[in-house]
C-alpha cells in the first residue's frame, strides 16, 4: 500500500521516496523473474486489434430495448487472437 499521509512534511517526503524506491526494486525483480524463468518479455505485449473494417455493430434486432446492456456480445463479431494468455500452464 502507498505510504500513509501522517507526520511532518519531511517524514512524508522520506516515506514516499523510500516507497518509490521499493516499488522500483519490486518492478526490477519481477522483470528479471519474467524474463529468466518464464522466458517472457518483461514489457507487455501490445494488444493485437483487428482492422476497423471488420468491426460492425449490428443494430437490427434489439438496440435501445435492453436498457443497461447497450451492446450485446452477439452484436460485435471479432475473432481475437490469443494474446491475453496468462502463460501459467505447467
Swiss-Prot record:
Keywords: AIDS, Host cytoplasm, Host nucleus, Host-virus interaction, Methylation, mRNA transport, Phosphoprotein, RNA-binding, Transport. One of its GO terms (biological process) is mRNA transport. A motif (Nuclear export signal and binding to XPO1) lies at residues 47-58. Phosphorylated by protein kinase CK2. Presence of, and maybe binding to the N-terminus of the regulatory beta subunit of CK2 is necessary for CK2-mediated Rev's phosphorylation. Asymmetrically arginine dimethylated at one site by host PRMT6. Methylation impairs the RNA-binding activity and export of viral RNA from the nucleus to the cytoplasm. The modification Phosphoserine is found at residues 66, 73. Its main location: host cell. GO terms for cellular component: host cell cytoplasm; host cell nucleolus. GO terms for molecular function: DNA-binding transcription factor activity; RNA binding. Residues 1-24, 64-90 are annotated as: Disordered. Residues 10-24 have a biased composition (Basic residues). Pfam families: REV. It is found in: Host nucleus, Host nucleolus; Host cytoplasm. Residues 64-78 have a biased composition (Polar residues). A motif (Nuclear localization signal and RNA-binding (RRE)) lies at residues 8-24. Homomultimer; when bound to the RRE. Multimeric assembly is essential for activity and may involve XPO1. Binds to human KPNB1, XPO1, TNPO1, RANBP5 and IPO7. The Z-84 isolate was taken from a 54 year-old Zairean male. HIV-1 lineages are divided in three main groups, M (for Major), O (for Outlier), and N (for New, or Non-M, Non-O). The vast majority of strains found worldwide belong to the group M. Group O seems to be endemic to and largely confined to Cameroon and neighboring countries in West Central Africa, where these viruses represent a small minority of HIV-1 strains. The group N is represented by a limited number of isolates from Cameroonian persons. The group M is further subdivided in 9 clades or subtypes (A to D, F to H, J and K). Escorts unspliced or incompletely spliced viral pre-mRNAs (late transcripts) out of the nucleus of infected cells. These pre-mRNAs carry a recognition sequence called Rev responsive element (RRE) located in the env gene, that is not present in fully spliced viral mRNAs (early transcripts). This function is essential since most viral proteins are translated from unspliced or partially spliced pre-mRNAs which cannot exit the nucleus by the pathway used by fully processed cellular mRNAs. Rev itself is translated from a fully spliced mRNA that readily exits the nucleus. The RNA-binding motif binds to the RRE, a 240 bp stem-and-loop structure present in incompletely spliced viral pre-mRNAs. This region also contains the NLS which mediates nuclear localization via KPNB1 binding and, when the N-terminal sequence is present, nucleolar targeting. These overlapping functions prevent Rev bound to RRE from undesirable return to the nucleus. When Rev binds the RRE, the NLS becomes masked while the NES remains accessible. The leucine-rich NES mediates binding to human XPO1. This is Protein Rev. It comes from Human immunodeficiency virus type 1 group M subtype D (isolate Z84) (HIV-1). The gene is rev.
Amino acid at each position: 500500500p502507498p505510504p500513509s499521509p501522517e507526520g511532518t512534511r519531511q517524514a512524508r517526503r522520506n516515506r514516499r521516496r523510500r516507497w518509490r524506491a521499493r516499488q522500483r526494486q519490486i518492478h526490477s525483480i519481477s522483470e528479471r523473474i519474467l524474463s529468466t524463468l518464464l522466458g517472457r518479455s518483461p514489457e507487455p505485449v501490445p494488444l493485437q486489434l483487428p482492422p476497423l473494417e471488420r468491426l460492425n455493430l449490428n443494430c437490427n434486432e434489439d438496440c435501445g430495448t435492453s436498457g443497461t446492456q447497450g451492446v450485446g456480445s452477439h452484436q460485435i463479431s471479432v475473432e481475437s487472437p490469443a494474446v491475453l494468455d496468462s502463460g501459467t500452464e505447467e
